[in-house]
Swiss-Prot record:
InterPro entries: Cyt_P450 (IPR001128), Cyt_P450_CS (IPR017972), Cyt_P450_E_CYP3A (IPR008072), Cyt_P450_E_grp-II (IPR002402), Cyt_P450_sf (IPR036396), Cytochrome_P450_3A (IPR050705)
SUPFAM superfamilies from the UniProt entry: Cytochrome P450
Membrane-protein topology: Peripheral membrane protein
Gene: CYP3A5
Cofactors demanded by this protein: heme
Name the record gives this protein: Cytochrome P450 3A5
GO molecular function, one term: estrogen 16-alpha-hydroxylase activity
Pfam family, one: p450
Paired cysteines (S-S): none
Organism whose genome encodes this protein: Homo sapiens
Length: 502
């Protein structure tokens, strides 16, 4: 039996021509960085360097940084990706040339009406939405919203107490994932869910389904390899985000909005209410107000941006506190001094806790959940003698910079004192857990407040210790956002017999 099919000469010729054309298409941009004298790993035809992401984006960036120095070039399919680590160049990209050249983040491909979400919106559309949402995230508004977040802190303590009383080690992701879910659905959708005890709630199920997204998702990969397919997918109504989930969440926002507009009572001040108010505000006359679909897109993107990140950072923080009991005790001492006898936290009390701020900042240095910052180059530009072509993507490898011994002594060590106000100031273009410049994370203040409140509440009531199930040293996962390879498990001891917040 012949192993080679007996095909006509014309068929073989057509096949050969097709393969040559595919090769030419798959390598057409791959000589760019070599011509510019920028080092980097050799790309594969069609794929570029995306297969290297399987080892973990954080690991890939760190290895490239060590091997190639302060700048290197890679390819995602045909897309040239330039990594920069020089603080002056980073400042130019994120701040000085943000509005003119580096306004937009990565294009995800077909996302339907979610393209108006603040994280995905582009150019003038992004500017408009950012200016409409910015008043929602001021410290004054967060202070007004604080009691809402605080009530979920009470639920967090109750749930952790219940788990700890079983006498078994506690999986932190379960507890903090529920807290994060409760806060985000409560503030963005106006619904109260004790998600740990109501896992079948449609909100919980929809949100978790929405979050199952990775860099190696087949649809996402096909868009990286063949970006010209994006308009085809859009015409076919194909979206990266699960359609049934998006529809459910969008309808939920509209239903809650109608309910609040029909009910003339004063409603609690959460993100949803602030966005509804902005639709009717005279202050928005300089910008077109948010449409109902745009409002829904913002509520939905808050889940995507906040759920996994908040629960992961809280888990990482308590892992570090459990493995550094001296730091844990010092932090508990500060909390007890500012809030004696387990007094309920206030906005002002949280803001004044310096050591808590240092602990959270150091955790975000070691574990920046967004491994990279990404900006698309809108036009040919030269920065510090480096030519960056239109259409390429510039990345700032946050994880690699946060672990660079040039900037951090013994970078793998957990040392909150690095962020002491008595020390030299930290370079804002090297330490970027929330990005920096006009397109930084709009929810930064909210995220920090949310995490700090959770830490205060649990540390008022409990102490955390490693147990035999705790993975030491901690290993990081290789997929998607920065998270542990295995869920973090710790022993939880009650600090006394009384339950705070009850």
């Amino acid at each position: 039996m012949d192993l080679i099919p007996n095909l006509a000469v014309e068929t073989w010729l057509l096949l050969a021509v097709s393969l040559v054309l595919l090769y030419l298409y798959g390598t057409r941009t791959h000589g760019l960085f070599k011509r510019l004298g920028i080092p980097g790993p050799t790309p594969l035809p069609l794929l570029g360097n995306v297969l290297s992401y399987r080892q973990g984006l954080w690991k890939f960036d760190t290895e490239c940084y060590k091997k190639y120095g302060k700048m290197w070039g890679t390819y995602e399919g045909q897309l040239p990706v330039l990594a920069i680590t020089d603080p002056d160049v980073i400042r130019t990209v994120l701040v000085k040339e943000c509005y003119s050249v580096f306004t937009n983040r990565r294009s995800l491909g077909p996302v339907g009406f979610m393209k108006s979400a603040i994280s995905l919106a582009e150019d003038e559309e992004w500017k408009r939405i950012r200016s409409l949402l910015s008043p929602t995230f001021t410290s004054g508004k967060l202070k007004e919203m604080f009691p809402i977040i605080a009530q979920y802190g009470d639920v967090l303590v109750r749930n952790l107490r219940r788990e700890a009383e079983k006498g078994k080690p506690v999986t932190l992701k379960d507890i903090f994932g529920a807290y994060s879910m409760d806060v985000i659905t409560g503030t963005s959708f106006g619904v109260n869910i004790d998600s740990l005890n109501n896992p079948q709630d449609p909100f919980v199920e929809s949100t978790k389904k929405f979050l199952k997204f990775g860099f190696l998702d087949p649809l996402f990969l096909s868009i990286i390899l063949f970006p010209f397919l994006t308009p085809v997918f859009e015409a076919l109504n194909v979206s990266l985000f699960p359609k049934d989930t998006i529809n459910f969440l969008s309808k939920s926002v509209n239903r809650m909005k109608k309910s609040r507009l029909n009910d003339k009572q004063k409603h609690r001040l959460d993100f949803l209410q602030l966005m509804i108010d902005s639709q009717n505000s005279k202050e928005t006359e300089s910008h077109k107000a948010l449409s109902d679909l745009e409002l829904a897109a913002q509520s939905i993107i808050f889940i995507f941006a906040g759920y996994e990140t908040t629960s992961s950072v809280l888990s990482f923080t308590l892992y570090e506190l459990a493995t550094h009991p001296d730091v844990q005790q010092k932090l508990q001492k500060e909390i007890d001094a500012v809030l004696p006898n387990k007094a309920p936290p206030t906005y002002d009390a949280v803001v004044q806790m310096e050591y808590l701020d240092m602990v959270v900042n150091e955790t975000l240095r070691l574990f920046p959940v967004a491994i990279r910052l990404e900006r698309t180059c809108k036009k040919d530009v030269e920065i510090n003698g480096v030519f960056i072509p239109k259409g390429s993507m510039v990345v700032i490898p946050t994880y690699a910079l946060h672990h660079d011994p040039k900037y951090w002594t013994e970078p793998e060590e957990f040392r909150p004192e690095r962020f002491s106000k008595k020390k030299d100031s930290i370079d804002p273009y090297i330490y970027t857990p929330f990005g920096t410049g006009p397109r930084n994370c709009i929810g930064m203040r909210f995220a920090l407040m949310n995490m700090k409140l959770a830490l205060i509440r649990v540390l008022q009531n409990f102490s955390f210790k490693p147990c035999k199930e705790t993975q030491i040293p901690l290993k990081l996962d290789t997929q998607g956002l920065l998270q542990p390879e295995k869920p973090i498990v710790l022993k939880v001891d009650s600090r006394d017999g009384t339950l705070s917040g009850e």
